[in-house]
């Protein structure tokens, strides 16, 4: 008897969809729905707050802080220079972002004229030399400085694969370990930013400003493995 492969494929697809639905997979939503408040407020400028570091890796804070400027600018936002911002915040004894994440952000709107403040919380940061991996977990919270409403909130749990492939298994292990050990800390931060900020709606200075509302929003919590 001739097998109807199209019918079989359709049946498998429908069965898989049913399984995913029964496991609680949420239906996709548009960016306009996921980030309704951001589209409503249309922030033009962003103040990047010093990261909140929950790990024992002191270097993680600087790496994340230094890696956020360019991705936000490329998304069409005016971003206050992190270096100047940090100096100003330190002069006002305001460089501890943890103090402000749940407090009023109006002073940042009045003093710095920033429309929004970006908080990042570093939850995991470690290198595993033998596995040639860098593991990074960061939460991103963009809040309005006018009314403290959350405009964008996502988290990334990223494993950066630094492995190197040769024709020798032992050499692979050694070279990969060295590659991981020498990897700049900023590599992990950049990969996490890539995962999360690519889903941020475009700002006024980007070509798709207010044209990306119908695009499907990415998941709130992203986990994955990327090559270095």
What are these model-derived regions, one by one?
Residues 24-42, 146-228:
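C-terminal/domain-edge helix-coil "capping" segments
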């Amino acid at each position: 008897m001739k097998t109807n492969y199209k019918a079989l494929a359709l049946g498998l697809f429908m069965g898989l969809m049913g399984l995913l639905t029964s496991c609680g997979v949420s239906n996709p939503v548009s960016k306009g729905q996921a980030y309704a408040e951001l589209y409503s407020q249309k922030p033009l400028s962003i103040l990047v707050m010093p990261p909140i570091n929950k790990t024992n890796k002191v270097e993680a804070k600087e790496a994340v802080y230094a890696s956020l400027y360019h991705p936000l600018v490329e998304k069409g936002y005016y971003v206050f220079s992190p270096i100047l911002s940090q100096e100003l915040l330190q002069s006002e004894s305001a460089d501890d972002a943890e103090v402000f994440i749940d407090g009023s952000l109006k002073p940042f709107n009045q003093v710095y004229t920033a429309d929004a403040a970006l908080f990042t919380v570093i939850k995991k940061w470690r290198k595993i030399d033998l596995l040639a991996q860098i593991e990074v977990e960061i939460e991103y919270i963009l809040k309005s400085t006018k009314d403290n409403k959350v405009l964008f909130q996502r988290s990334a749990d990223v494993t950066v694969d630094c492995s190197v492939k040769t024709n020798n298994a032992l050499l692979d292990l050694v070279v990969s370990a060295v590659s991981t050990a020498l990897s700049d800390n900023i590599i992990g931060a950049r990969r996490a930013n890539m995962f999360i900020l690519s889903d941020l709606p475009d700002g006024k200075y980007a070509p798709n400003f207010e044209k990306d509302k119908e695009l499907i929003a990415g998941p709130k919590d992203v986990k994955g493995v990327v090559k270095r």
